[in-house]
Amino acid sequence: MTKKKSHKPGSATIALNKRARHEYFIEDEIEAGLSLQGWEVKSLRAGKANISDSYVIMRDGEAYLFGATITPLNVASTHVVCDPTRTRKLLLKQRELANLYGQINRDGYTVVALSLYWKNAWCKIKIGVAKGKKDHDKRDTIKDREWKLDKARIMKNANR
């Protein structure tokens, strides 16, 4: 029998959007595939992606990732035009597209990119249906996080 291939060392995560969880309430998460060109796959394998300002737009019954930057490698071909910020099509089932379209038609909701990662040999993106936070909500989140740290520090010192 043949041995199973062990996966490559390192993380499968290519890029994270940490700002999304700070600026939005994430209500639903969906995994989607990406339609990529060859040079984009090579750049993603090198980890040259940024999804911090990216979001999803719906056009003609399809979902597209807008604002994601994939920086081309220096060794990319000269006869291929590399557009780092091109709009990329998301690969979703019709049922998922209809569900997503219904959720974002509500007032104040949008779809943001949360993370970009490898699943087996395929590049996947996790998108989230999100509602924007107000300033006081952001302050409450920071206050809760700091209180957790203080509480852990107090408990650590109390157990000595």
Curated annotation (Swiss-Prot):
Q: Which InterPro entries match?
A: SmpB (IPR023620), SsrA-bd_prot (IPR000037), SsrA-bd_prot_CS (IPR020081)
Recorded GO CC terms: cytosol
Which GO annotations describe the biological process of this protein? trans-translation
Q: Does the keyword Cytoplasm apply?
A: yes
Q: Which UniProt keywords apply?
A: Cytoplasm, RNA-binding
Mention one GO molecular function. RNA binding
What Gene3D superfamilies does UniProt report for this protein, alphabetically? 2.40.280.10
Q: Which domain of life is it from?
A: Bacteria
Where found, per UniProt? Cytoplasm
Asked if the Swiss-Prot or TrEMBL record annotates the protein with the keyword Cytoplasm, the reply is yes
Q: List the disulfide bonds.
A: none
Q: What SUPFAM superfamilies would the database entry show? A: Small protein B (SmpB)
One Pfam family linked to the record: SmpB
Under NCBIfam families, the record lists: PRK05422.1, smpB
UniProt similarity note: Belongs to the SmpB family.
Relate the protein's function as given in its record.
Required for rescue of stalled ribosomes mediated by trans-translation. Binds to transfer-messenger RNA (tmRNA), required for stable association of tmRNA with ribosomes. tmRNA and SmpB together mimic tRNA shape, replacing the anticodon stem-loop with SmpB. tmRNA is encoded by the ssrA gene; the 2 termini fold to resemble tRNA(Ala) and it encodes a 'tag peptide', a short internal open reading frame. During trans-translation Ala-aminoacylated tmRNA acts like a tRNA, entering the A-site of stalled ribosomes, displacing the stalled mRNA.
Q: What is this protein called?
A: SsrA-binding protein
